[in-house]
Amino acid sequence: MAEKFTQHTGLVVPLDAANVDTDAIIPKQFLQKVTRTGFGAHLFNDWRFLDDKGQQPNPDFVLNFPQYKGASILLARENFGCGSSREHAPWALTDYGFKVVIAPSFADIFYGNSFNNQLLPVTLSDEQVDELFKLVQANPGMTFEVDLEAQVVKAGDKTYSFKIDDFRRHCMLNGLDSIGLTLQHGEAISDYERKLPAFMN
């Protein structure tokens, strides 16, 4: 079972860049592992650090600004997560501490991979995202409330509606990944296996 996602309130960091690809999110040299942990240290590695070893933080990169330390909601521009298909991208984001990414659009494969890893991708219009960028940049340290049950983002005195398809929403709300979904049918699977001819067992 994955962690259930119903509502999250968190600090927002504005990443004002369009077409952020998966190689920027987690560069290819860090993809040797197949476990989901340990990738947060290398999130946006080429932007966050000035050296190859990840020891000299780039003071001009927004994730390194002290007012955004501990951010769990990433605000981004269109076509977030484009590029090669790598599930390591949502792994890196969640391992770093992000629960939600808000953008006008997402690359299709990244969008699907996010739900598989309990990272909520929220799609709002360009105009709404522009509003949110202005709001966050004028109020560093601002928090948003993201309510998956109601499908709304609350930012200050404004509320923005978003839509997640019913199946993905059900899975997120109930903490169901592909394994969890399969286990829900464990009894039916066992019944089927018991009925198989002996030569198939």
Curated annotation (Swiss-Prot):
Keywords: Amino-acid biosynthesis, Branched-chain amino acid biosynthesis, Leucine biosynthesis, Lyase. This is 3-isopropylmalate dehydratase small subunit. Pathway: Amino-acid biosynthesis; L-leucine biosynthesis; L-leucine from 3-methyl-2-oxobutanoate: step 2/4. Disulfide bonds: none annotated. It comes from the Bacteria. Its EC number is 4.2.1.33. It catalyses: (2R,3S)-3-isopropylmalate = (2S)-2-isopropylmalate. The keyword Plastid does not apply. Belongs to the LeuD family. LeuD type 1 subfamily. GO terms for molecular function: 3-isopropylmalate dehydratase activity.
